[in-house]
């Protein structure tokens, strides 16, 4: 896979003023492969299963605590 290059060039001359914009972006395959390796390591195999279980448990406790606090303040006796 070859790196993709994109460029934007804008130039305008009006009333003696000069505006110019020039942008260039290059996406490297090295960064993409690094991200892909990290995602494959964290999302597959035993480590991936452990990450999903830990994420599910953390999400459960966050929702549980938010529900508890909401119920406490909604049903609080005055």
UniProtKB/Swiss-Prot annotation:
Changing residue 43 to S: No effect on cell surface expression of the Vel antigen. Residues 1-20 are annotated as: Disordered. Signal peptide: none annotated. Residues 1-18 have a biased composition (Basic and acidic residues). The keyword Transmembrane applies. It is a single-pass type II membrane protein. It is found in: Cell membrane. Residues 1-46 are cytoplasmic. Changing residue 22 to A: No effect on cell membrane localization. No effect on cell surface expression of the Vel antigen. The modification N-acetylmethionine is found at residue 1. GO terms for cellular component: cell surface; plasma membrane. Residues 68-78 are annotated as: Displays the Vel antigen. Keywords: Acetylation, Blood group antigen, Cell membrane, Disulfide bond, Membrane, Phosphoprotein, Signal-anchor, Transmembrane, Transmembrane helix. The chain crosses the membrane at residues 47-67. Highly expressed in the bone marrow and expressed at lower levels in non-hematopoietic tissues. Highly expressed in erythroleukemia cell lines. Up-regulated in CD34+ hematopoietic progenitors cultured toward red blood cells. Residues 68-78 are extracellular. It comes from the Eukaryota. GO terms for molecular function: protein homodimerization activity. Changing residue 35 to S: No effect on cell surface expression of the Vel antigen. Homooligomer; disulfide-linked. Regulator of red blood cell formation. Belongs to the SMIM1 family. The extracellular domain carries the Vel antigen. This is Small integral membrane protein 1. It comes from Homo sapiens.
């Amino acid at each position: 896979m070859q790196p993709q290059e994109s460029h934007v060039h804008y130039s305008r001359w009006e009333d003696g003023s000069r505006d110019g914009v020039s942008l260039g972006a290059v996406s490297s395959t090295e960064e993409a492969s690094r991200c892909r390796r990290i995602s494959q390591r964290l999302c597959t195999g035993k480590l991936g299963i452990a990450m999903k279980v830990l994420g599910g448990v953390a999400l459960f406790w966050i929702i549980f605590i938010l529900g508890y606090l909401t119920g406490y303040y909604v049903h609080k006796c005055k």
